[in-house]
């Protein structure tokens, strides 16, 4: 409240500045005192001239203030004397010099990811599904060990009478000597040389030096087979897997009764045998041999069906002819291609045109003469006609 009173007092002093004589200049002293002791500057108030509104708003001088008069109201104020004694008044510190120490509250931020609690898993003992030691199972004796002895009458006698059968078939057969129709040592068969080993050399007139191409005949049966590397699909070392012992290693011991009961079969055959009839043995007919044996080799059947020698011969000749004809056909195609290329190159050049025409004629003649012999060879190598010359296959 004292602060508010002091401020009200200051406002009254400022308001009375207009009515106080200017010689005292109280407001200036107050302003300087406030500024000196408290550091406060009061605002300067400008009072408008309400009586002379048309006058310029210039600050009046000291002489002008002396001459101002108030015609409308004459106020005679007694002279006011101020005795100002300034004392050092200890005012409370409105603005504190040292800021108070503000203790901020410590805020504990909760853990967003809390630590998981340690859960103690209880140890569960799993019972043995299959016990290691199986119990011994005692099988009840279905068949009793001590069976009663039942005596059955003897229908069949213990000792049968011996019956002697006469020897109808003689034991010692007469030895019959058969002549050697098929000789032990077969004769050597010479196959005629239809294909000559050395072919005749055909001399071609050297009209143009020709280098014939070297034709490699393919091997019918390859000597060296290609090595094929098979990738190791199956690993060399297989992983070892341990199979769990589902079935126990030691099987249970089962006691089986060792005593087997003796069962007596009744004698179905009667004791007294009746007189049996005559026993008929089968008659065996031996093959009758001719009285006059042939001196020469036997004549084979006209048809060679079922003859093993003929079958082998025909198969071998058939395979050889097919292989040989394939080789001849390949050689013919390659030779024809080479000669046609040579003749076309000669005929295309005008300088060697005459030689080219001769080449075409020569090509036709030589191909016909060479391969006519091969065609005749094909006819001679028919399996049936060729195998007729082989003995034992006529």
UniProtKB/Swiss-Prot annotation:
Keywords: Disulfide bond, Glycoprotein, Signal. Disulfide bonds join 310-393, 313-387, 343-359. Residues 306-394 form the Saposin B-type domain. Residues 1-18 form the signal peptide. Glycans are attached at residues 25, 272. InterPro entries: Saposin-like, SaposinB_dom. This is Saposin-like protein 11. It comes from Caenorhabditis elegans. The lineage of its organism: Eukaryota, Metazoa, Ecdysozoa, Nematoda, Chromadorea.
């Amino acid at each position: 409240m004292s602060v508010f009173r002091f401020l009200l007092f200051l406002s009254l002093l400022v308001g009375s500045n207009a009515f106080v004589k200017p010689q005292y200049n109280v407001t200036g002293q107050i302003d300087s005192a406030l500024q000196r002791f408290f550091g406060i500057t009061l605002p300067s108030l400008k009072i408008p001239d309400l009586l002379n509104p048309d006058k310029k708003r210039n600050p009046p001088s000291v002489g002008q203030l002396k001459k101002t008069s108030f015609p409308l109201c004459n106020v005679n104020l007694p002279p006011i004397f101020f005795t100002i004694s300034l004392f050092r008044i200890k005012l409370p510190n409105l603005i504190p010099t040292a800021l108070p120490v503000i203790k901020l509250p410590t805020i504990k931020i909760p853990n967003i990811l809390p630590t998981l609690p340690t859960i103690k898993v209880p140890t569960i003992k799993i019972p043995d599904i299959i016990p290691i030691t199986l119990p011994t199972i005692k099988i009840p004796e279905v068949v009793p060990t001590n069976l009663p002895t039942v005596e059955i009458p003897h229908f069949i006698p213990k000792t049968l009478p011996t019956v002697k059968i006469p020897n109808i078939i003689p034991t010692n057969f007469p030895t019959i000597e058969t002549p050697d129709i098929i000789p032990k040592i077969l004769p050597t068969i010479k196959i005629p040389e239809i294909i000559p080993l050395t072919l005749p050399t055909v001399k071609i007139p050297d009209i143009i030096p020709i280098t014939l191409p070297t034709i490699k005949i393919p091997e019918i049966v390859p000597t060296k087979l290609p090595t094929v590397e098979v990738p190791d699909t199956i690993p060399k070392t297989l992983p070892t897997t341990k199979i769990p012992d589902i079935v126990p290693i030691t099987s249970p011991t089962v006691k089986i009764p060792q005593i087997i009961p003796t069962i007596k079969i009744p004698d179905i055959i009667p004791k007294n045998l009746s007189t049996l009839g005559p026993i008929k043995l089968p008659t065996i007919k031996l093959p009758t041999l001719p009285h006059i044996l042939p001196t020469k080799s036997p004549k084979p059947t006209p048809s060679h069906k079922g003859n093993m020698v003929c079958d082998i011969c025909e198969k071998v000749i058939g395979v050889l002819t097919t292989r040989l004809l394939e080789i001849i056909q390949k050689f013919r195609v390659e030779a024809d291609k080479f000669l046609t290329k040579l003749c076309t190159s000669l005929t295309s050049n005008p300088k060697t045109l005459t030689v080219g025409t001769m080449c075409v004629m020569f090509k036709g003649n030589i191909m016909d003469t060479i391969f006519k012999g091969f065609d005749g060879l094909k006819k001679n190598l028919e399996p049936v006609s060729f195998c007729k010359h082989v003995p034992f296959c006529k």
